[in-house]
Amino acid sequence: FIFFILGTLFSCKKTDSHPDINEKLLRILDDKIKHKKYYEIKKKNHIQKLKKEALLYKNNDSISYHLNNLIVEEYLGYQCDSAYIYSDKNKEIANRNNNEIWLYKNLLQRSVLLSTTGLFVESKEILDHINPEALPSPLRFSYNSAYECLYSNLSDYSGGDSPYNKIYKNKLADYYNSAYKALKPGDPFYYLFLSHKNRVENNWSQAEQNVNKFLKTTHPGTRLHAIGSFCKAVIDGKLGNIESQERCLIYSAISDIESSTKENRSMQDLASILYQKGETDRAYKYIQSSLEDANFYNARFRNIQISKVQPIIEETYLQTINTQNKQLRWS
């Protein structure tokens, strides 16, 4: 199956508007979905390698903490229950060594994990008990980023019609601003969070420029490329660049599969767009893939989001199948 495609095709940047490009990419995505297991095996093998290395250094707390941290990061977008196990290990190591920096890093990472799985109250409780002034400079960005993750997920969960959504958006603006200020220009995340800030301020053209700068630092097939491509898709949608929006969602979905990122959003949004265009078969296939990922990751609030869309697409898909079967019987 397809492992490599032309670099000019597989890049979320401005290209000539042509629907054939999107169709070619959709065929690649179809193939990737068929071979999700291959990428899952790669992911599992990489994690297993880290676990074996961690066992070799189980008596060295410094190395163990570092390796456990890497394992949590691998599990963070892949399988939340396993991420909690190694997060607990590092909390124990940090407390045993009375190491405040290790403990802060662990708490911030755990807060992100909690909000990603829909445990918003528990995530906020951790962050509210941290004094940002006590944090060392390198962790200031992580602190603001963790709050950004919390309010971003709360905003997604509540939906645009919720009276709380505006509150979450205002909080997001504050933490976007604080997050990018904690970084220096040239840091890739500086441009990503500056782009987020531009979006909240409705400066969509500037947001596009900054997310493009971030995307240049990422590589296809990685979680960061998936995130950047999704953010660009959101911006393209607001700017009315519909074909580019769809294209960037495809890039993002492909990178999610190749990096075995199960906590994702692109496939769900892509399914909705294709459904609106009347491409019921693909929409059904993509929303089922999205639901499968959410169930695997155990993302409660992502399941709720998908459940609002999946039955509508499924009903139309089944109606189409029934109509086709009737036509075959009478032909």
For each feature predicted by the language model, list its residue ranges.
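Selective detector of the "anchor" transmembrane alpha-helix that sits immediately C-terminal
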Residues: 330-331
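A "functional boundary" signal
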Residues: 1-326
